[in-house]
A protein has these predicted regions:
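A generic alpha-helix surface/boundary motif
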Residues: 7-8, 172
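N-terminal intrinsically disordered/low-complexity leader segments
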Residues: 1-6
């Protein structure tokens, strides 16, 4: 790990947290992922060996704890790791407000999008009985064009293969459109009205889709307005 050669606490924190992928791994831990495979779903373009290296470094730095047996480790945030939560949230909110660029194809990832949605959609919006929502992304890579979110008894499951249940709602759109909705670049209902998103199913369910889907937590935070400022007596 390269050093900035500075005693400044910011520089020392950056030496640890600003290595490629490190802060994204911390984001996944803050979001609730505790197992290697679950963390990997949030960083699908990160190699397993690099993820292992970053987790090892975070353990050595005291940011996370590793427990369990080899091959079945559980990772949890330490006190130091938990204190990163507001930092990560503000970093993401700042990114939503100031670092957003137009989405390019390289930025689009159906697996990451659906995994993020799976842990954020609000199951309380739908009845407690099983509700199956199918997502179709015709322009996504082969093998990532169809996804199913199954809402039942307050739980959400994500399936890449047909779960074999009756589908209640079908949502069909370009991957970029749903990504824009998820990151609050446009509203779901507005995209439906424009014809960018096609929705099929019971109107009692489709009318609630915008509330059910919600949006990226970091984008929601960034959309709230001006971020808090810390007192820094610069002259």
């Amino acid at each position: 790990m390269n050093s900035y050669g500075q005693f400044c606490p910011l520089a020392q924190a950056a030496q640890l947290l600003c290595e490629r992928w490190t802060l994204i791994v911390v984001r996944e831990l803050i979001a609730g992922s505790t197992r290697f495979n679950k963390i990997k779903k949030g960083v699908p373009r990160m190699s397993p060996s690099l993820l292992s290296a970053r987790l090892k470094r975070l353990v050595e730095a005291g940011v996370i704890e590793q427990s369990g047996n080899k091959g079945n480790y559980t990772y949890s945030l330490t006190e130091a790791g938990l204190e990163l939560r507001p930092i990560v949230e503000l970093f993401g909110a700042w990114g939503h407000r100031w670092a957003r660029s137009s989405l390019n194809r390289i930025d689009l990832d159906a697996g990451l999008l659906m995994w993020d949605m799976r842990r954020t959609v609000d199951p309380a919006v739908f009845p407690s009985c099983r509700i199956v929502v199918q997502f179709e992304y015709p322009d996504a890579p082969k093998g990532a064009r169809n996804w199913w979110l199954v809402s039942e008894n307050g739980e959400i499951d994500l399936c890449l293969s047909d779960p074999g249940h009756n589908v209640d709602v079908v949502i069909k759109c370009p991957l970029k459109t749903m990504t824009e909705v998820w990151t609050l670049r446009q509203r779901f209902n507005d995209a439906v009205k424009k014809g960018d998103i096609k929705v099929m199913g019971d109107s009692k369910l489709t009318s609630k889709l915008q509330d059910w889907l919600g949006a990226s937590p970091l984008s929601r935070l960034g959309a709230l307005g001006e971020l808090p400022r810390l007192a820094w007596n610069a002259k």
